Amino acid sequence: MLAGTVTGLRPPAALALDNGAARTPPMGWNSWNSFGCNINEALIRQSADAIVASGMRDAGYQYVVVDDCWFNPNRDAAGNLQGDPGRFPSGMKALGDYLHGKGLKFGLYQVPVDRTCAQYFGSYPGATGSQGHEAQDARQFAAWGVDFLKYDWCSPNGTIDQQVATFARMRDALAATGRPIVYSINPNSIHAKTGPQRNWGDVANMWRTTEDITNAWDTGQTNGYPMGIQNIINVTVPLAGYARPGAFNDPDMMEVGRGGMTDTEMRSHFAMWAVLAAPLIAGNDVRSQSAATQSILTNRNLIAINQDGLGLQAAQVSFDGTRRVLAKPLANGDVAVALFNQGSATTTISTTAAAVGKTGTSFTLLDAWTNATSTTGGAISASVPAHGTAVYRVSGGGTTTPPPPTSGALVSAASGRCLDVPQSNTANGTQPVIWDCNGGANQRWNISGDTLQALGKCLDAPLNATPGAKAQIWDCNGGANQRWSRNADGTIRALQSGLCLDVNGAATGNGTTVILWTCTAAANQRWTIR
């Protein structure tokens, strides 16, 4: 078997949601963003001390995760993992005991293949991945008191089905230990970006949606290395339907406090992670963070929104390519509303209480940044600087739950066949067809706000489309030509062109292409979610 190759397909067994962990998004700190492989016992202990002294622990940050390069390059004679004796002379259990003694929890990094990412790229010796050692390593983690496992794919090999089966082996091995361990996976590392292609909640507590983050606002990537904050948001917003207690989209460890962005952008970064129900895993050097960074990371209003017991990710209410409105229902009936300016100039962003799921005529708005309150009859509006985000907690009135983000098959009323990405081809410009419904990932569409996404790509109408233009999938980019409305008559209309999703020529056979056509509400333009 080639190094890094995975075999042995089988369906998932136990649900990750049954492990009792991560009922709200995990909060903590990870060593990688600031230190990479340059880690040791003293650094981790100093960082833990700083988390306590700064008030971060009391704000909810509890997991201290030691990333790649913590291990001895060789397993012991019995095949057990060992901490690197030079870097961690007291051993990994002693480190876990130290963290637990501080009221914190202990996280470690490992991979399901033969080599970690650092080993794959030759920056760290050995081949100490968990491939073939899953049960043994899970028992070792439990014996060391590990509370959080980051499990990074680190291989170009493997189909998405092989990834599911391989990640599930460690999920089940962790469950067999009887110790509640948050299970965090990254299917994207050194691999095609499969993170956004399925709901991984049957496999893990949290899963990465994109390629690795960097401390920049916009790198121009759609899902390639490195990803800026806005780029990650564009991918993660349409995945809202996947989030629930015990299972969360992970847009990556935070870059707040690491430079490369303005204070406004840092605040937006944290605010958007909060409303997206993302794990709040800090990545800065907490030993020397500024007062401004500490203030952002410990904002109690945003943390309360993030940690709300409903565990819902904010869904998109509206987006015009610049001004984005998201709404996150909260357990007590309040709604958190984010007004996010993706443009390069200050602009006013507006919505209404009704649009975000509230009923009534009188509401209180709590500004999550200033803690100021105001009242409104329904209008919610703010002047938002470039790359800024205003967040309000809307209380009062009643709550009408807006249509939740939905994931499922889109079935043509004319044929009973499903909207299908042929051969799971994710190349930009691939034209969907109808095909016998089979439950495949290439027939699962995530519908959130006004976007439709499959296999990590967005349903897209060509610019300046006219009747007969093909529908296609394309990298999600927030463009107006990727916005759709689902209508009461079952049609799906492209908001930019006004044309409807149409099965070409009203044909019903497998492989019939899907195009854009003048809306008629005929059976070949009507779709149901299943």
Regions found by a protein language model. Name each.
Residues 1-15:
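Secretory targeting and sorting signals
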Residues 4, 399-530:
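Lectin-like carbohydrate-binding module/patch detector with strong preference for beta-trefoil
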Residues 14-45, 50-53, 181, 185, ...:
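N-terminal module-boundary/linker segments of secreted carbohydrate-active enzymes
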Residues 25-31, 60-67, 105-110, 142, ...:
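Structural recognition of the beta-strand scaffold that forms the well-ordered cores
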Residues 47, 51-160:
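Aromatic-lined carbohydrate-binding/catalytic grooves of carbohydrate-active enzymes
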Residues 133-136, 182-285:
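Glycan-recognition surfaces
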Residues 273-276, 281-283, 319-358:
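Carbohydrate-binding surface patches
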Residues 376-399:
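C-terminal beta-strand-rich structural cap/linker in extracellular carbohydrate-active enzymes
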